Amino acid sequence: MRCGKENDLVYIITGFVLLPHKVPEMDGTVSSMLLARALVMAFGAKPVIVCPADSVQAIEKCAAVVGLHIYEDLDIVQTLPLSMGVVAFTKTLADAPAQAAELAARKPAAVVSVEACGANALGVCHNAVGLDVTALQARSDVLWE
């Protein structure tokens, strides 16, 4: 049984940036990469990691480890075998809706979130101990609106 069509895009949102070092956590990133590989192998999907710019280098390095080629150009991703994409999502709330609209226009078959931050009703992102980490996070939560 197949889900969607071969070469369908699947967005995987990840990349929570941690204090005090202000670097992305890695367990969500690694899990996202393994999910990306599974989607390619099982369904012929074209996974795209949507993450803060801070995470792009780690994603690019992990792609080869899971046996996938990685591109920032999503048109290329959809034409090459064993490939995936990465999109650096803005941390600026004012720019987020336009970037989200660009991604949505590509009509992904699915959107999955793995340890990505989302703002509360007041527009604030908090870490596990309640600290405000809004300025550190990609505002990819607008993809759910």
Regions found by a protein language model. Give the residues of each.
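Positively charged, low-complexity intrinsically disordered leader regions
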Residues: 1-9
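Short, glycine-rich nucleotide/cofactor-binding loops
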Residues: 9-10, 14-31
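Short glycine-rich anion-binding loops that position phosphate/pyrophosphate groups of nucleotides
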Residues: 16-18, 116-119
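Short internal beta-strands
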Residues: 46-54
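A glycine-rich helix N-cap at a beta->alpha junction
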Residues: 63-98
